[in-house]
Amino acid sequence: MKFFVDSANIEEIRELQNLSLVDGVTTNPSLILKSGRNILDVIKEICTLIEGPVSAEVAATEFEIIMKEAAILAKIADNICIKLPLTLEGLKACKALAAQGLKTNLTLCFSANQALLAAKAGATFVSPFIGRLDDCGINGSELLHEIRTIYDNYGFETQILAASIRTVNHVKEAALSGADVASVPPTILKALVKHPLTDKGLQTFLDDWKKTGQNIA
């Protein structure tokens, strides 16, 4: 499973990239707002750091305007992935952009039916929001399983990009569900390495090593 860091913060992305933990980046209007920067500037800078797909989201809901914004975003770099709302207009734009050879990410997916439509429209990625479903008392990981089954049944090539990840357990659930990608906030991505027994065991080894009085270097 690939990791796309969910951030528009250049320093956060650079730190994780230096650890070889980033296969791509996802952004959205909320993250752009949080960055305090112009969307075109920040997306361009991210694309200079990351070789994998960088999702940049349109701010339009009507087909013609979506296509205009997508054309502007697509010119930023070859690894741009146009992020679209999972609506009828978004599906129409997805089909048109896919015909142009552009990568697309249909976002705000909350049902298997929506994911089926995304695949039929030729989306590169579909983004089920598992955290927001959990907030509503619906099992988000179950949706991932449903989408995986449907895609495997019909040989769809659209990749499942698990989004709205709130916990390290969400990452595990995404992997167990067969998601192709997890869109993970930097704090969660770094937390994956943590386990209290690892810390405890390491401290024991360090204490014992100190008692040997030896040095390796």
UniProtKB/Swiss-Prot annotation:
It catalyses: D-sedoheptulose 7-phosphate + D-glyceraldehyde 3-phosphate = D-erythrose 4-phosphate + beta-D-fructose 6-phosphate. It is found in: Cytoplasm. Gene3D superfamilies: Aldolase class I. The active site is at residue 83. It comes from the Bacteria. One of its GO terms (biological process) is pentose-phosphate shunt. InterPro entries: Aldolase_TIM, TAL/FSA, Transaldolase_3B, Transaldolase_3B/F6P_aldolase, Transaldolase_AS, TSA/FSA_arc/bac. GO terms for molecular function: aldehyde-lyase activity; transaldolase activity. One of its GO terms (cellular component) is cytoplasm. Pathway: Carbohydrate degradation; pentose phosphate pathway; D-glyceraldehyde 3-phosphate and beta-D-fructose 6-phosphate from D-ribose 5-phosphate and D-xylulose 5-phosphate (non-oxidative stage): step 2/3. The keyword Transferase applies. Its EC number is 2.2.1.2. It is an enzyme of class 2 (transferase). Its main location: cytoplasm. Keywords: Cytoplasm, Pentose shunt, Schiff base, Transferase. It holds the Pfam family TAL_FSA. The keyword rRNA-binding does not apply. NCBIfam families: fsa_talC_mipB. Belongs to the transaldolase family. Type 3B subfamily. Transaldolase is important for the balance of metabolites in the pentose-phosphate pathway. PANTHER family: FRUCTOSE-6-PHOSPHATE ALDOLASE 1-RELATED (PTHR10683:SF40), TRANSALDOLASE (PTHR10683). This is Probable transaldolase. It comes from Bartonella quintana (strain Toulouse). The lineage of its organism: Bacteria, Pseudomonadati, Pseudomonadota, Alphaproteobacteria, Hyphomicrobiales.
